[in-house]
């Protein structure tokens, strides 16, 4: 399960009371949830060329890590940010350095950061495995931080970025590229999302499982692939029904479908 620990559209954040943190931990244990992760605020951009925004973003990551640690959450999923008008290589390095700074400022905590693959919409970084690998390589130079940074692969994002997920031969090649460039040992979570847009569109628009351009057949290949069998899949599919209102049945439908495809 993935949660937000704060309002994702505001910089200001209310502290978590210890009583609430304890109750949350007890609820997770009682529900027998195998994994709970957090997602960071959408305002955060550690790659920003604006020093003021970047400073706020780094502090934002620190806050996310502190809140996750208090709640017993091992990972915070974070987008690497956007380059804006900067050279992409410069922006990649700034993103990595921002993550380094946030991890150093929380060195006594155990929670870490999962860098999320992106669709590459606009100037967003992380739409190629090479860019993610470059960030990891820069962070890994500080050995004490290596265990606190890994990767979250989003199926919609990698598909929109141009990585095919079917037929099996194409999925095998995508996984091979990921392993050779980043390493499957760094893959901790998969966001399971279909895509409203076509392969290589670079448009980040999620769709329900089997209802988009990725398709049901590709998700069957994904959830049964031997190299992904130990990686948790977490939904980020749309919550709204046909009337545009939140419909909790959507999550139930998507979970049941993934489980059927896995069997």
Describe every region a protein language model picked out:
Residues 1-3, 36-40, 76-78, 113-115, ...:
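Hydrophobic faces of well-ordered beta-strands that scaffold small-molecule active sites
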